[in-house]
């Protein structure tokens, strides 16, 4: 078996140590390690993290391969330091059967760049009317444990209750896209001062908050797990905080873009800033950062949403919603959370690896960097600063809101079970 010696890495941001990989596992962590014939990677004080886990990725295959494929999406994931991603169900056909989730899972196995765990749809066709084959998807080769109609809300309270009851049997989780559809008809951006000035249809915070309030109460009533996708408002934070104080089994995520960007950017009418849920206010951004720091929000998830050029290069009203994020997520988290002192690197590992792996039951991921553990690792040059150039993305799509923006940090190496998928910033 091949061996790799990572020399002088700051494990979770601590003091420099050596990490020896033997085959698929970490053999040793310490100082002055040596191994005959090992490939040596001089970390020179770079930060070593467990491989990142994304609980919310859109890989688009099957059906929208013009936006992304499992292969290109997992290459983007490896470039961003991810070793495991959860693929949302809003594909064509929808991932609402054992056959479709197994197809996505097998495509991930074949890619070799990143493990792919499919997310199953809650309802047939994402139509919100009838439960999908939750049990069959769980029992399939893909072993689905997370279910979501993301892109749409499970708006019917009876359907949501039944889904929570069903997944409780195997400790699954329903990941809710919190958006009350009647309150967001014709919505184009956050409802507030900017939407009023621009004359664009407003997307009120209560459309998100009302669904979260309902669903945490349903989860309490059923005694099941619920996960809230992409929190975007200060009010949503308060509801989740209240629910956790009652002992309700709720977890929540925030995207990197909601930690950094505000609705003021929509004044440019650049559709790259059009996203669901919409960019909110500075007050919301600060509340989300604080909630991620204090643990009210459990994890960072990218909501990587690739779109072809023609779906974004058009007038605002006609543009698709969504941003790519796998290749910039860690840099945005460093800028908003680490460089501001809100989180240390151990906190980043917790929010971007340990906890998402736990929520999604991702076996072998989100593990400590210690002897005997799977060698799923990410090496980060935290001292680096550079401009984002989407021309260099591994993703098939380029719809990033950060083009030309200077961000800190760069992933230099990623290892998936001991195999280097990224070396010196280049995919293998």
From Swiss-Prot:
Substrate binds at residues 58-60, 90, 276, 307. Pfam families: Amidohydro_1. One of its GO terms (cellular component) is cytoplasm. Zn(2+) 2 binds at residues 150, 177, 230. Signal peptide: none annotated. The keyword Phosphoprotein does not apply. The keyword Lyase does not apply. PROSITE patterns: DIHYDROOROTASE_2 (PS00483). Its cofactor is Zn(2+). It is an enzyme of class 3 (hydrolase). It catalyses: (S)-dihydroorotate + H2O = N-carbamoyl-L-aspartate + H(+). Binds 2 Zn(2+) ions per subunit. Pathway: Pyrimidine metabolism; UMP biosynthesis via de novo pathway; (S)-dihydroorotate from bicarbonate: step 3/3. The active site is at residue 303. GO terms for molecular function: allantoinase activity; dihydroorotase activity; zinc ion binding. Catalyzes the reversible cyclization of carbamoyl aspartate to dihydroorotate. Belongs to the metallo-dependent hydrolases superfamily. DHOase family. Class I DHOase subfamily. This is Dihydroorotase. It comes from Streptomyces coelicolor (strain ATCC BAA-471 / A3(2) / M145). The gene is pyrC.
């Amino acid at each position: 078996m091949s061996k790799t010696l990572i020399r002088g890495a700051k494990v979770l941001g601590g003091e420099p140590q050596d990490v020896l990989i033997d085959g698929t596992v970490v053999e040793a962590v310490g100082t002055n390690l040596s191994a005959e014939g090992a490939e040596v990677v001089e970390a020179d004080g770079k930060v070593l993290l467990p491989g990142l886990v994304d609980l919310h990725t859109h890989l688009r295959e099957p059906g929208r391969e013009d936006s992304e494929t499992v292969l290109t999406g997992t290459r983007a994931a490896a470039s961003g330091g991810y070793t495991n991603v959860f693929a949302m169900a809003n594909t064509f056909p929808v991932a609402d059967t054992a056959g479709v989730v197994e197809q996505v899972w097998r495509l991930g196995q074949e890619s070799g760049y990143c493990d792919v765990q499919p997310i199953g749809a809650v309802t047939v066709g994402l139509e919100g009317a009838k439960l999908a084959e939750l049990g069959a998807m769980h029992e399939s080769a893909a072993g689905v444990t997370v279910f979501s109609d993301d892109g749409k809300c499970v708006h019917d309270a009876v359907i949501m209750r039944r889904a929570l009851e069903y997944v409780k049997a195997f400790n699954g989780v329903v990941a809710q896209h919190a958006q009350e559809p009647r309150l967001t008809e014709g919505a184009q951006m956050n409802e507030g001062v900017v939407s009023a000035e621009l004359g664009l249809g407003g997307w009120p915070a209560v459309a998100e908050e009302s669904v979260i309030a309902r669903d945490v109460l349903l989860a309490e009533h059923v005694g099941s797990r619920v996960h809230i996708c992409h929190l975007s408002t200060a009010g949503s934070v308060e509801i989740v905080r209240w629910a956790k104080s009652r002992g309700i089994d709720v977890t929540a995520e925030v995207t990197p873009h909601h930690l950094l960007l505000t609705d003021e950017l929509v004044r440019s009418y650049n559709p790259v800033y059009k996203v669901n849920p919409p960019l909110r206010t500075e007050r919301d951004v600060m509340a989300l950062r604080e909630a991620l720091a204090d643990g009210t929000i459990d994890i960072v998830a990218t909501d990587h949403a690739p779109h072809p050029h023609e779906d974004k290069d058009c007038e605002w009203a006609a543009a698709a919603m969504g941003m790519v994020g796998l290749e910039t997520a860690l840099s945005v988290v460093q800028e908003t959370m680490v460089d501001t002192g809100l989180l240390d690197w151990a906190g980043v590992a917790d929010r971007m690896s340990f906890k998402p792996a736990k929520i999604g039951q991702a076996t072998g991921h989100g593990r400590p960097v210690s002897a005997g553990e799977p060698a799923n690792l990410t090496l980060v040059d935290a001292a680096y600063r550079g401009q984002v150039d989407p021309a260099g993305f591994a993703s098939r799509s380029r719809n990033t809101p950060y083009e030309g923006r200077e961000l800190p940090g760069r992933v230099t190496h990623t290892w998936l079970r001991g195999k280097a998928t990224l070396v010196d910033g280049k995919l293998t």
